[in-house]
């Protein structure tokens, strides 16, 4: 699994927990993604390439053109996971969600979002993912334990989505 460093530690922790190995790509001295290094590595096959965009901990992100360059270079056998946990905080500048550019991503991909950050529902442990295909979604759902998201969390997430304008102000 290829990931950026430093970044959200659970990308590495879960990989190791499942017996996988982690390859770290260092971000630059300005705490931004080294696009050249990322594109060079993305062109080579890997089981998974996962990183936060916007970045954790720096808040920097790849702009739409940089995402296009990355997607064009990505090896088609590598699954790409974009962790957009901080998506709602990127309300200024030239941020674009990976969801707006998915037609450009070769092969399998997943975009992750959470209600933990801007929605303030961290204790409820709820989020969602959008997958490149129904088959991938079903494959990812197979090992999920039953009842892993409680009803209160589901009700709170729905209420948050019903009042998105409140969160944005």
Question: What spans do the regions from the language model cover?
Answer:
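Active-site pre-lysine segment of PLP-dependent enzymes
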Residues: 16, 33-45, 57-80, 84-118
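Active-site donor-binding loop signature of nucleotide-sugar glycosyltransferases
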Residues: 27-29, 53, 114, 142
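Amphipathic alpha-helical repeat scaffolds
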Residues: 53-56, 150
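PLP-dependent aminotransferase-like
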Residues: 1-51
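Glycine-rich, N-terminal phosphate-binding loop of Rossmann-like dinucleotide-binding domains
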Residues: 5, 52-53, 84, 89, ...
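PLP-dependent aminotransferase class I/II
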Residues: 108-169
């Amino acid at each position: 699994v290829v990931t950026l460093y430093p970044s959200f530690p659970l990308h590495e922790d879960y990989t190791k927990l499942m017996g996988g190995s982690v390859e770290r790509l260092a971000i630059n001295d300005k705490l931004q993604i080294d696009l050249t290094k990322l594109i060079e590595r993305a062109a080579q096959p890997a089981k998974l390439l996962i990183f936060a965009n916007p970045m954790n901990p720096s808040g920097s992100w790849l702009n739409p053109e940089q995402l296009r360059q990355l997607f064009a270079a990505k090896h088609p056998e590598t699954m790409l996971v974009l962790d957009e946990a901080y998506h709602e905080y990127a309300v200024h500048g030239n941020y674009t969600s990976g969801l707006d550019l998915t037609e450009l991503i070769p092969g399998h991909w997943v975009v992750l979002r959470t209600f933990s950050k801007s929605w303030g529902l961290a204790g409820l442990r709820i989020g969602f993912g959008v997958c490149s295909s129904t088959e991938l979604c079903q494959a990812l759902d197979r090992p999920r334990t039953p009842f892993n998201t409680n009803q209160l969390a589901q009700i709170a997430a729905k209420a948050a989505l019903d009042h998105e304008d409140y969160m944005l102000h």
